[in-house]
Amino acid sequence: IELPSQQSLSLLAPDKKKESILRPMQLISGRIEENSTELVKYRHAPKFAPAGQSTQMIIGATRETDLQILRLSERLYQKYRLKRVFYSAYLPVAESPLLPALTTKPPLLREHRLYQADWLLRYYGFTSDELLDEKHPSFHPLVDPKCGWALNHPELFPVEVNRAPYETLLRVPGIGVKSACRIVTARRQGRLDYGALKKLGVVLKRAQYFITCSGKLADGL
């Protein structure tokens, strides 16, 4: 895809059209779906595109917001079943009135925040419109997207780790997919305390502000 919007394509690559980029994605997505049906019927049918399909977006060459970029990624995952969207910070290599100045630094931190948000879309059950909105269309450079979401929703915290469902645990800063699974499994054997959470892989220096164990906050809070 390279550029996140038709406006950017028209500005920097007028010979390219959005439809000419998306049509092959649609064809590949359809063929992958057909192939999955074939594999059910015929065990030895050859696999089509076993690694799936991916695309890349250039970040910082044009003026799209993080929200616009993330919404596009979300649609690509949903509609074309992409395996991965890659984000690449724009590195100025040529002088042009249409592009950032050669002295512009690549937006590497912004790239990193988009990768973090992309992970939340794919594995944590978030949507783009939960993470950003029209009033706040870009991520804070000093706060990761998951923590930013939690800070904006104090009414949802603290979460009691001994009772919260898996989907709720995933939204707690400092709790990842693996540690959420471990919590759900471990608490069947007994109530968990902060020491147990640390052993299960929870990053307590972040999670402690958003959780309770048996109704208790972490020491010092």
What is each model feature region?
Residues 1-125:
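Conserved AdoMet/S-adenosylmethionine-binding subsite of the radical SAM
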Residues 100-170, 204-221:
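Long, highly charged, low-complexity intrinsically disordered interaction regions
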Residues 186-187:
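Residue-level signature of tetratricopeptide-repeat
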Residues 190-194:
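Short, basic-rich loop-to-helix N-cap that marks the start of a DNA-contacting helix
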Residues 195-199, 208:
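Short Lys/Arg-enriched helix C-cap and helix-to-coil transition segments
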